[in-house]
Amino acid sequence: MESAGKQDNNATQQLPQRQQRGNQQANKNLGKHNAQKQNDSADGGPAEKKQRFGGPNAQNQNQNQNQNGGVTGGGGAVGGPNQNKNFGNNKGGFVGNRNRNNNRAGNQNRTFPGNNNPNQKPNNETSKADGPNALAKNNEPATAAAGQNQANQNANKGQNQRQGQNQNQNQVHGQGNQGGPGNQGGAGNQGGQGNQGGAGNQGNGQGFRGRNAGNNQGGGFSGGPQNQQRDNRNRSGPRPGGGAGGAMNSTNMGGGGGGGGGGGPRGGEDFFITQRLRSISGPTFELEPVEVPTETKFSGRNRLYVGNLTNDITDDELREMFKPYGEISEIFSNLDKNFTFLKVDYHPNAEKAKRALDGSMRKGRQLRVRFAPNATILRVSNLTPFVSNELLYKSFEIFGPIERASITVDDRGKHMGEGIVEFAKKSSASACLRMCNEKCFFLTASLRPCLVDPMEVNDDTDGLPEKAFNKKMPDFNQERSIGPRFADPNSFEHEYGSRWKQLHNLFKTKQDALKRELKMEEDKLEAQMEYARYEQETELLRQELRKREVDNERKKLEWEMREKQAEEMRKREEETMRRHQTEMQSHMNRQEEDMLRRQQETLFMKAQQLNSLLDQQEGFGGGGGGNNSTFDNFAGNSNSPFEVFRGNNNNNSTMIGNNAAPNTQDSFAFEFGVNNMNQGGNQRGNNGGGNNVPWGRRRF
């Protein structure tokens, strides 16, 4: 990061500087001992201000580095609509504009011209009404300087004190700028990268816990992606409690900004209830008996109301007052209206305390002690006859701890279709009442949802004693002027008494008729439900049947396709086999032809060898002159097997043998050549005519 401010190329002198106000300390974060900032001087005061004007790109260099929400200089520099567009990473909240205009009472952000800042602009001291901030000039960067803000980015992690223009006098985050010396919360907004804001807003006890949408985790104003400095308006308004919690805070679980925002939806509670419900959604044939203690200590039934107290009573005095009757807890006193709610350990002790203290005098006032309304008891109706105490307990235990759960029966032990569930906490009863009214909660396979209503249980067995009446009232005296009596027949009293009886009898008749009608409608709905269930099951079976038919058709098509593929494969294999056999046959024929050709060549070679051998032997015979050659028989045998007749050469020669006659031919003779010395073959004879005929004429 750059540690020094940008220098303007045209700047000839140093810009005006802010001075420290009087002897007032620079750090107004009361109760906080913050480390010295990087731009602070040795005595705790702010260092000299860097030059305010940067280069041509000084306004936009800090778009992604300013994690304090756009305006880090406090009230000095007002962020313009286009100078800092760090909309996605606004982790600190837009507090600079608010400190600029909303804290005029405490004078936290005003600068005073002096020796060190002779060129201070006078419009920084003018007070303006709360509302939208004025647009900043384009030549004044909203972040005081791009390089200066980058240098102070890491220094903002611990304190987020506004250095530079604000001179550490306005610690913005935390409780916001309260305008006075108690401007706390600077230790929150751990700025820069994390900016978790956990320790911030400690004055309010609430902070941005990191659940706001859009990375707004600091204790600033109007967190979330809606915190955009487009119009230079502080979207959180003048709330000093740490901001409104962000526009998207309503969708967060728990949520809650600093002093605003509020909690998110009850998604977490509903989620855990749903998870517990899934664990018991199976069959409930065998349920273990529920062992509930006879009486729970400090239960909702033991809550007493004590009225007509003095406004100076304390919890210790109440404990001392109820000490003879037992231990008390959960005391809630409203001294403005002079009443108190408290819980006694056990119900008998609560009854004793009520009887003893009700009507007693304390400091000239008559105390009134009553059992407080118990909002933890619910009446569950529209139950089927197969719901037991154990099933009722297990079913409603998902909403919270239960002290008692029982089914209401008549004097014969018959199921009355309703029950009572008493929770240990009011929040559990409220969650049960809300979810059962919003949704349909079934306990068995029947589609009759249970109906849940608050049940008013009157544990007051004392009734209304005579001392509770104000006997000075005229109505009391008029009513008590005549005592008990029976009316005489056909008298005025008897006539109007009979009318009252008829009215109540009519009510009972209509009530009974309504109950019978309700019973008939319930039976009718039950029959419709069973028929609809049967139709639904039948429709499911039809759908399953159609699905199976579709699957059957698909499988049939697949089988036919496989058969077709197998037939095609068989045909291809047959064709391949036939082609292979044809190739084998042709190959065998070629081999046979080659063998015959080789045999012929072999015979021809042997004939040539034999011819050459005969030629050699003819050369051994000798005789004759010129080119005549004779063929003598072997071993001087007169019966020579061969006789060669040579062609019409110039010099005819005949085979010479012992018994051979000249120019005589054998009856069996075979002529191998031609009688022409100039045609074909290796012809013997005159060498002048060529040697193309292998033999002239031979006789075997």
Curated annotation (Swiss-Prot):
Keywords: Coiled coil, Phosphoprotein, Repeat, RNA-binding, Sensory transduction, Vision. Residues 302-374, 376-457 form the RRM domain. One of its GO terms (cellular component) is catalytic step 2 spliceosome. Residues 568-582 have a biased composition (Basic and acidic residues). The keyword RNA-binding applies. The keyword RNA-binding applies. It comes from the Eukaryota. GO terms for biological process: male courtship behavior, veined wing generated song production; mRNA splicing, via spliceosome; phototaxis; regulation of DNA-templated transcription; visual behavior; visual perception. Residues 9-29, 54-69, 80-89, 96-124, 144-175 have a biased composition (Low complexity). Residues 1-270, 568-591, 677-700 are annotated as: Disordered. InterPro entries: NOPS (IPR012975), Nucleotide-bd_a/b_plait_sf (IPR012677), RBD_domain_sf (IPR035979), RRM_dom (IPR000504). Residues 505-616 form a coiled coil. It holds the Pfam family NOPS. GO terms for molecular function: mRNA binding; RNA binding. The modification Phosphoserine is found at residue 236. Residues 70-79, 176-208, 253-266, 682-691 have a biased composition (Gly residues). Required for normal vision and courtship behavior in Drosophila. This is Protein no-on-transient A. It comes from Drosophila melanogaster. The lineage of its organism: Eukaryota, Metazoa, Ecdysozoa, Arthropoda, Hexapoda.
